Amino acid sequence: MNLQNKILKGTTTVGIKVKDGVVLAADRRASAGYYVAHKYVRKVLYVTDNIGITTAGSVADLQFIYEALKYIYHRNSITGEGPITVKGIATWLANVLSSSKYFPYLVQILIGGVDDQPRLYNLDYLGDITEEEYTATGSGSPEALGVLEDNYKPEMSLDEAAELAKRAIFSSIKRDSFTGTGVIVTKITKNGHEEKEYYITKR
């Protein structure tokens, strides 16, 4: 199995950027091969109130990167350099991933947030970075992208984007055996984030 397949297997995450903010969403299943390792894993995390990430890939690598992102953000605030921007966070991480490409972190990460405007970035394990209007990662991304491409509109509201992200993940749950249990959807604005959880059946 190649590196890209290892990273893609086991999850679906979605990011959508609209004029009022950014929506991030992810399913909750963790799989090890064809085994469901955990049903309620958190794949939407927050660097600060108005910057979030979604995660796919090696749990150990993701934990290290998440703690590093929080450290960089808070270090800048403490040292008086001022809050780092969403673009700054994404660029810093892209440099870290690129410099480690011979011994790569096995991750695929979406970074979304709002400072002067909404921003959404997609980063792969080699440090390639793209700014997106909408995107999906993981083994269920083909199904999710189909829903996004058919329904995304730049002028849609944040609530409409959140509903679309939920639909995209649930579409993947129906078709992808590595995606499952439920969905976490968060709406991010410059004032913070609001998160909701949805499940196939009651917990």
UniProtKB/Swiss-Prot annotation:
Keywords from the named record: Autocatalytic cleavage, Cytoplasm, Hydrolase, Protease, Proteasome, Threonine protease, Zymogen
Gene Ontology biological process terms, A to Z: proteasomal protein catabolic process
Activity modulation notes: The formation of the proteasomal ATPase PAN-20S proteasome complex, via the docking of the C-termini of PAN into the intersubunit pockets in the alpha-rings, triggers opening of the gate for substrate entry. Interconversion between the open-gate and close-gate conformations leads to a dynamic regulation of the 20S proteasome proteolysis activity.
Record keyword Cytoplasm present: yes
One Pfam entry name: Proteasome
GO cellular component: cytoplasm; proteasome core complex, beta-subunit complex
Gene Ontology molecular function: any one: threonine-type endopeptidase activity
Entry's localization field: Cytoplasm
Propeptide residue intervals: 1-10
Source organism superkingdom: Archaea
Enzyme Commission number(s) of this protein: 3.4.25.1
Catalytic reaction equation(s): Cleavage of peptide bonds with very broad specificity
Positions annotated as active site in the UniProt record: 11 (nucleophile)
Chief location bin: cytoplasm
Entry similarity comment: Belongs to the peptidase T1B family.
HAMAP family: Proteasome_B_A
Protein function: Component of the proteasome core, a large protease complex with broad specificity involved in protein degradation.
Assembly information from the UniProt record: The 20S proteasome core is composed of 14 alpha and 14 beta subunits that assemble into four stacked heptameric rings, resulting in a barrel-shaped structure. The two inner rings, each composed of seven catalytic beta subunits, are sandwiched by two outer rings, each composed of seven alpha subunits. The catalytic chamber with the active sites is on the inside of the barrel. Has a gated structure, the ends of the cylinder being occluded by the N-termini of the alpha-subunits. Is capped at one or both ends by the proteasome regulatory ATPase, PAN.
Protein name stated in the entry: Proteasome subunit beta 2
Source species of the chain: Sulfolobus acidocaldarius (strain ATCC 33909 / DSM 639 / JCM 8929 / NBRC 15157 / NCIMB 11770)
